[in-house]
Design a protein with these regions (language model features):
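Juxtamembrane loop-transmembrane helix junctions in multi-pass integral membrane proteins
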Residues: 3, 41, 45-48, 71-74, ...
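N-terminal signal-anchor transmembrane alpha helix
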Residues: 2-30
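Mid-chain, well-packed structural core segment of small domains
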Residues: 59, 66-96
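Juxtamembrane boundary at the C-terminal end of a transmembrane helix
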Residues: 120-131
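Interfacial loop-to-transmembrane junctions
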Residues: 89-116
Length: 131
């Protein structure tokens, strides 16, 4: 049972709700029903959510596959926690300002590190099973 990945999937789902709520509140507050209405804050809220969505499903699938293939729980927690923290950091950085900043940079760095780490872990686990 992939319980560790289920835990991070649940945290990711909650983060998804928070980020989509930011978009919804901007829409209501600015009476924008579709698109960004030319509003930079609305545009940033949409990109924060969109950027999150672009990575979330892939990371959760990779995490679940890693767990199924027997990657250690310690590493699964490291990858899962780093992903969630990275996405929170990126969201804070991008929502605050469109300019490059430490939150945004550290968020994308953590996210990409998790993707690379999980890819390597999956390759190694797969090679152990095949070989």
């Amino acid at each position: 049972m992939p319980v560790v990945s289920a835990f991070y999937a649940a945290l990711t789902a909650l983060l998804c709700v928070v980020l989509s709520s930011l978009v919804i509140s901007q829409r209501f507050g600015k009476a924008i029903s579709l698109g960004d209405g030319g509003d930079p804050t609305m545009s940033r809220a949409m990109r924060v959510f969109g950027n999150f969505a672009e990575y979330a499903a892939l990371v959760i699938v990779l995490l679940a596959l890693a767990e199924i293939l027997g990657v250690s729980r310690t590493w699964l927690h490291i990858y899962g926690a780093a992903f969630v923290l990275g996405r929170i950091s990126h969201a804070i950085g991008l929502y605050r300002t469109p300019k490059p900043n430490l939150f945004r940079a550290s968020g994308v760095t953590l996210t990409l590190a998790v993707l690379v780490g999980l890819a390597i872990a999956l390759l190694l686990a797969t090679l152990r099973k095949i070989g």
